[in-house]
């Protein structure tokens, strides 16, 4: 008779918990964001419908970019985990650098596309009024301004999870959506109106980027020290 072992279940659950919590966090942020856009959009020239529609489109575009980074991360996790368990820390560090480099290159390509071709990207999802494209293009260029740095956060979250640091992996997965973005999209519109939502994005991205770098450098430094010893 198959009898589950609690210690094994905890280990298995911890590996997927970061992704699970991140998906829940994204849903919560989207709900809050839609309500903020509806409220502040009604007090702007755009009305409430245009901002919500535009943000929905741009969220889909961002999901394409994030799906690629998450795919690279998931493909790298067995490599990180196996070599970390074998104490081959040089390979762990090398694999992490390759993953970050790959995601950064992809992120940079998306960044330039967002900045140079916002009208064409938004137009893929349909037509709209002049105000619709005006808001969508501006939102895409401002909110996604830090796209070139956005690949490091999901890579770092997956990295920490794969080497047995599930709690830190969960924290890293929550940095952008919950710890930084959620408070900013609530606070900024109080002073800047609907524009506050746009500027909350790159600031949250920058903060999550810095935090990911700090924690990753610390852990990679420990591995380097362990190799010397």
Task: Go through the PLM ranges and name each one.
Residues 4-32, 37, 60, 64, ...:
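Hydrophobic faces of transmembrane alpha-helices in multi-pass small-molecule transporters and flippases
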Residues 54-112, 116-118, 150-172:
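Small-residue-rich hydrophobic transmembrane alpha-helices
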Residues 176-180:
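Small-residue-rich segments of transmembrane alpha-helices in multi-pass membrane proteins
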Residues 41, 160, 167-169, 187-188, ...:
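N-terminal membrane-sensor/transducer module of prokaryotic signaling receptors
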Residues 19-35, 70, 74, 102-111, ...:
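Hydrophobic alpha-helical transmembrane segments in multi-pass membrane proteins
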Residues 9-11, 49, 60, 64, ...:
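Hydrophobic alpha-helical transmembrane segments of integral membrane proteins
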Residues 1-17, 80-146, 188-229:
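Short alpha-helical transmembrane segments in multi-pass integral membrane proteins
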Residues 27-57, 64, 82, 120-130, ...:
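Helix-terminus/linker motif at the lipid-water interface of multi-pass membrane proteins
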């Amino acid at each position: 008779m198959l009898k589950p072992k609690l210690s094994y279940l905890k280990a298995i659950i911890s590996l997927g918990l970061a992704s699970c919590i991140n998906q829940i966090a994204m849903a919560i942020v989207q709900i809050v964001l839609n309500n903020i856009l509806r409220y502040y959009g009604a007090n702007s020239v755009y009305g409430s419908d245009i901002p919500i529609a535009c943000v929905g489109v741009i969220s889909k575009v961002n999901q394409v970019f994030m799906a690629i980074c998450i795919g690279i991360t998931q493909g790298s996790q067995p490599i990180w985990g196996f070599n970390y368990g074998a104490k081959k820390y040089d390979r762990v560090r090398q694999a992490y650098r390759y993953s970050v480099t790959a995601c950064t290159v992809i992120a940079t390509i998306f960044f330039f596309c967002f900045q140079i071709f916002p009208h064409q990207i938004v137009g893929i999802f349909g037509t709209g009024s002049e105000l619709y494209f005006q808001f969508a293009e501006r939102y895409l260029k401002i909110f996604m301004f830090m796209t070139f740095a956005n690949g490091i956060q999901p890579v770092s979250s997956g990295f920490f999870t794969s080497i047995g640091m599930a709690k830190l992996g969960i924290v890293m997965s929550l940095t952008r959506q919950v710890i930084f973005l959620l408070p900013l999209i609530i606070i900024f519109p109080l002073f800047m109106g609907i524009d506050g939502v746009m500027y909350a994005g790159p600031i949250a991205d920058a903060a999550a980027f810095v935090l990911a770098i700090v924690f990753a450098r610390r852990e990679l430094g420990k591995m380097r020290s362990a190799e010397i010893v």
